[in-house]
Amino acid sequence: MDSSLEIKTITTLPKEYVNQNISVFNKVLSSLETISELAKDHLKSITSKDGRISNSLLEKHQFRAHGLAWFETYRIGLRETFNWIKLLQDTKNDTDLEYAVMVYAFSEYLNQMRYGIMISQSEVIRPSTLNVDDEKFSFFNSPDVQELIKYGASDNISQIMISSMENGIFPNLGLNDDTL
């Protein structure tokens, strides 16, 4: 994460922020999908022989394969968190707490996906590991995405989540199962 990131006190509640910026979340998810396809195509090209995945080539490029798996876990996690919010909206079970969780996740994961996902103390997956040019992450530098990252990293978002948990209030999982 950029240490010069200025974190301001927020005045817009998370639910309102997300609803006002839904197109930003869609843009992020679409951009990450494009990056994912490029990374998968590259990995397939360097691990295939005679039209099939080669065990020896996969072993040779294990770090990249492992890195792509981590990247995909983050990308799909963001997509499904976004879908979770849509489900909660549709069933009118959404509160600011769930939106706070989502914007926090987008802020944290986007920074890691852009600058490096630490998979161990000595291994960091960066876009270059996946053969992704910086240009493909240009969406990250747009003012609306930078605002999302700042908003999600704000003390107010953290405080909403911490305060809720301290008071025994947890996010609605939206699983429609009364036993959970």
Functional labels for PLM-detected ranges:
Residues 1-180:
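Flavin-dependent oxidoreductase catalytic core characteristic
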